[in-house]
Amino acid sequence: MITVSKDGCGDFTSVSEAVKHASANDTIFIKKGIYRERVEITAPLTFKGEDAENTVIEYGMYARMPMGNEKTGTFRSYTMLVNTDGFQCMDLTIANTAGFGKDVGQAIAVYAEGDNIRFENCRILGHQDTLFTGPLPFKEIEKGGFRGPTEFAERRFCRQYYINCFIAGEVDFIFGSAAAYFENCELFSIDCGNEINGYVTAASTYEGQAYGYVLNRCRFTGNCSDNSVYIGRPWRDHAQTILIDCKIGNHIRRELFHDWNKSSAHDTVNYGICGTNADPSELPDFVRIIDRTEADFILKSITEQ
């Protein structure tokens, strides 16, 4: 085990330095402290924080920040980049401290691209585009929009797991194409003072993929005004987001999902709920009620993979 400690009592004082010296499948234990740095992981490692609230990796890059002769852009703004299969992270906070989206644009805390990635008992904090669950969609909408570490990577099926995590943000703060499973997570929407305060998810699930986002026993909380946040909208037309036994706060819009003004997506998205405290009569026609049999099948399919 490699130990990181700011007081010099470990093997390294920097998480990035520990990563550089680690071998595949090593465990890096990170002692309490605020580590202001960007961390890039390209090998299957395990991160274990001493305490989730008091072991913090933070940085403050953002999309509108100048980088050479251009802007940083969304996908180079990350605090932590996970570009490998089989990474695990436990008991740690990863934050992008750049600030509100209206001021700085997108600012990723965790950029996760790879299969069998797992975050457990973690806090992932940001504002706009907090957590990117890669891979990217097949094509960008604007030229150069995907500039970043996996711009030219193979677009492939990637499974990710977020267990007992606290994830905070405002606009599209969980987004991407992964098959991502969230269990017993708290998804906290930050008030940004608008009539519509934001969107929790923006999936870009690939056409034909078995599932996109599945949220099981999660809690949607926030400090926003009532009826001001959507649970999701489709970043791409085949977005999938399924809610099973989730608890929805009063800040969530009664219709739950927005179509991002894409009427064509009504026939292609897969938005569904089961056992969730929402009024079915308020749901738009592109959101369906899932019965318990289908919900159990979805959960079984995920756990058996």
Residue ranges of each PLM-predicted region?
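Sequence-level preference for short, compositionally simple segments enriched
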Residues: 1-305
